[in-house]
Amino acid sequence: MVRFIFVTGGVVSSLGKGITAASLAMLLQAKGFRVSVRKLDPYLNVDPGTMNPHEHGEVYVTDDGAETDLDLGHYERFTGVTACKCDNITTGAIYSKLLKDERLGNYTGITVQVIPHVTNIIKDFIMSNTNGFDFIICEIGGTVGDIEGLPFFEAIRQIGNKLKNANCLFIHLTLLPYVKTARELKTKPTQHSVKELRAIGISPNILVCRAERNISKSAIDKIALFCNIKPEYVIPAIDQKNIYLVPIAYHNSGLENKVLNFFNINVVPSKLDKWYDIIDKIKDSNSKVKIAIITKYHKTQDAYKSVIEALNHAGIYYKYKIDVLWINAENLTEENINKKLLDINGILVPGGFGVRATQGKMIAIKYARTNNIPFFGICFGMQLATIEIAQNLIGIQDAVTEEFKIKGTKIIEKINKNCEDATIKIKNAHISKCTYSEAFECDASTVYTNIHEDSNNLSTDKLQIETNFRNMSDIEKTMRLGAYPCNLVANTIAANAYKSLEINERHRHRYKFNNEFQNIFEQHGVVFSGFSQNKQIVEIIELPELRWFVGVQFHPEFKSKPFEAHPLFIQFIKATIEYNKSNEQQ
């Protein structure tokens, strides 16, 4: 029988509900249980794909092409379980489905209301696709008291009433603010948060209290008394220097054992060797390298969350600390770049969209290329690298990308329908796992076929959804989302890094390198080391005569994990370490 665990938050947002849910999932896995983690977001956007990264952070892309909340990245990195679109839902997706069903007459003329119709969709989402799991952990976005979150809280309240304590547990994460003048942690906000939660019919079974310092026994007893919870079920969540220390901190507090005790499940020893190994490497990391990330969305680091973590994973691999220097590309010029990038060991240009800040990024790419500094370009970063090479190395002064809609030689062009299934979203998920959530993006014009990217190689493990193009915008038609296979060229940087000639990586782009220019690029030393299966889309470029200069069309950061760093990030950090050592010897 599957058991449901709901993680809610109070007092303030950004307390770490996603890290808590991911940590608990990992700790239960370490005891041999099968766990799925899901995120329910109350905002009205259908998905975060069109949201400003300054507001929402990065868009995390799953294998099956879903644009999801960045917390799914935490779930994958902590548990190693591949997420899919059925692990994330929003109010926008719910209302989109509900209104389509109403227009199609599926509600047979009755009055459609928040209760029961919206809440029923939420409950169906939570309780679907549970086969094969011992626990389903659901994180509810936002904080208790938010008006947009009320249908979600009502839905999980109803689930709790139906399943009772034997199969349902509520974890509430709150903040204990430290008041310097009083020299103590204040419990009153937590008390009021629990009061708010209980007012809508949910009594938390476990309280996780976030604090910047240790919580005294008297404070825990006070929280337990006023929140009607046993003291042993008040779990401290003390700030950690590294997020990968959080799971072990929860383990030391007995979080997973408290969960098992609540469900009357026998507690068995945990297998946490790989996590202790990670912690040892983090603590042994005394040396560091300095990486400049050339950003467009500079106001929040969450816009590049997976990139940061992938760098850290490679740092853990080599027992090196990664010192990230955030560079606002809009402020980067030929005149100030020497000063701004002083003493850096590597340059990374991540993905992005639009013309803003591109000039600064290209200046950084030129600086890396001409000064032989390790460079890594991801998605748009690779595209800009080809434009910089065209302009400054090959001599195509008017080289541009079609995305900017300006006159010039289009080195980067829009993906078209001839580019190997690039006009639709490939669904690479486990088909049996995603049966319910497909209803949120399919309508009567949708046709399902089981097909591989190569039409001559049928495969039942991939789901291709071909949607009526008349109902799609031009942007939707050309977006290439999700995991696609890629063939590598032997004896290249990429092939040596992966130790394989066939890989599978996640994509999120609607433009590609113009293959008409491949020959002239090769004549100037560029190696095209990765292609889509029919060679229509360039996936990887290299400048092998330099220390390390690689651009990739995909997003390798989405597949990196603390215990399995991505091979390209490993090689990039290796190059920065060697570059740093060579500078120290001079």
Curated annotation (Swiss-Prot):
GO terms for biological process: 'de novo' CTP biosynthetic process; pyrimidine nucleobase biosynthetic process. Residues 1-265 are annotated as: Amidoligase domain. L-glutamine binds at G352, F380, G381, M382, Q383, E403, R510. Its EC number is 6.3.4.2. Residues 429-473 form the RPE1 insert domain. Pfam families: CTP_synth_N (PF06418), GATase (PF00117). Pathway: Pyrimidine metabolism; CTP biosynthesis via de novo pathway; CTP from UDP: step 2/2. The keyword Transcription does not apply. UTP binds at S13, K186, T187, K188, P189, T190, Q191, K222. Gene3D superfamilies: 3.40.50.880, P-loop containing nucleotide triphosphate hydrolases. Keywords: ATP-binding, Glutamine amidotransferase, Ligase, Magnesium, Metal-binding, Nucleotide-binding, Pyrimidine biosynthesis. PROSITE patterns: GATASE_TYPE_1 (PS51273). Residues 290-582 form the Glutamine amidotransferase type-1 domain. Allosterically activated by GTP, when glutamine is the substrate; GTP has no effect on the reaction when ammonia is the substrate. The allosteric effector GTP functions by stabilizing the protein conformation that binds the tetrahedral intermediate(s) formed during glutamine hydrolysis. Inhibited by the product CTP, via allosteric rather than competitive inhibition. Mg(2+) binds at D71, E139. ATP binds at S14, L15, G16, K17, G18, I19, D71. It catalyses: UTP + L-glutamine + ATP + H2O = CTP + L-glutamate + ADP + phosphate + 2 H(+); L-glutamine + H2O = L-glutamate + NH4(+); UTP + NH4(+) + ATP = CTP + ADP + phosphate + 2 H(+). The active site is at C379, H555, E557. The keyword GTP-binding does not apply. GO terms for cellular component: cytoophidium; cytoplasm. CTPSs have evolved a hybrid strategy for distinguishing between UTP and CTP. The overlapping regions of the product feedback inhibitory and substrate sites recognize a common feature in both compounds, the triphosphate moiety. To differentiate isosteric substrate and product pyrimidine rings, an additional pocket far from the expected kinase/ligase catalytic site, specifically recognizes the cytosine and ribose portions of the product inhibitor. Catalyzes the ATP-dependent amination of UTP to CTP with either L-glutamine or ammonia as the source of nitrogen. Regulates intracellular CTP levels through interactions with the four ribonucleotide triphosphates. Homotetramer. This is CTP synthase. The gene is pyrG.
